């Protein structure tokens, strides 16, 4: 009996190992076979993923998708986008409808450990705040006792707002909507006293209101909201490719490499780490099953982290959000990437 149990356990272990091997690399193989990355994004958030009048998508989350395509194919245009609501996003990833979720999604323990998904990094450090009309005369979120609060359903915001009001002995009435645009319209129409969401999303929604200057973001940040790309758990190869796409952008900024000077830097790398990153020394692309110019292609076609931040949400964008904690570690922020070596 004991021998039979051992044999059964051994057989199960072999089957599990085979299954894991089958899953490893499956996404990259499928992506290369179909010729593009299918990327899940938001259903319309300026600065992160937003379509213009011609249907062209732009934003930080979109640029991560483009970066992955540049790494895999050497062509950042080989990506297709699937706009998803907060309720739809995880099912779309779990079912295989999308290869990657790059959709202003907060990294939490339950999502990372309990839903069969893995977060590859943090593209934007954020926190939940409140948007309200300046005529209300509010100076602090602690003045919101009794307020009606617009919230997007299926987001981390619902729980965080409940916790904040409870901790401060305040009452509120939540009004939920499936889409962020719907919650913004409800706020503008007077249905809600305030709108709660990630602060970056509040700035993005504010510019879509009729008179943006009349609306203010209250100073309190009531939670930690690290936003980043998500992949299915179990495919370490694909996980690494998506993770190192962001790391390449961060390393490039730290080394002073951007889309305009990358050819000059590649021709004469100043340090061994720069030579490794740009594919001039070593065989580091092999570890990712990619060409050694994978990072060069990301930087050349999409840019470094500073470039994607500033053009989408920073000084070159209508949002004018300051880098803050999204600065590099050596410039007062907490963004940091391991070296390519």
UniProtKB/Swiss-Prot annotation:
GO biological process: amino acid transport; peptide transport
UniProt-listed Gene3D superfamilies: Periplasmic binding protein-like II
Family designation: Belongs to the bacterial solute-binding protein 3 family.
Signal sequence annotation: 1-19
Name the record gives this protein: Putative amino-acid ABC transporter-binding protein YhdW
Organism: Escherichia coli (strain K12)
Pfam families in UniProt: SBP_bac_3
Function: Probably part of the binding-protein-dependent transport system YdhWXYZ for an amino acid.
Main location: periplasm
Lineage of source species: Bacteria, Pseudomonadati, Pseudomonadota, Gammaproteobacteria, Enterobacterales
SMART domains documented for this protein: PBPb
Keywords assigned by UniProt, alphabetized: Amino-acid transport, Periplasm, Signal, Transport
Protein location: Periplasm
Highest taxon above the source species: Bacteria
GO cellular component term, pick one: membrane
Keyword Signal: yes
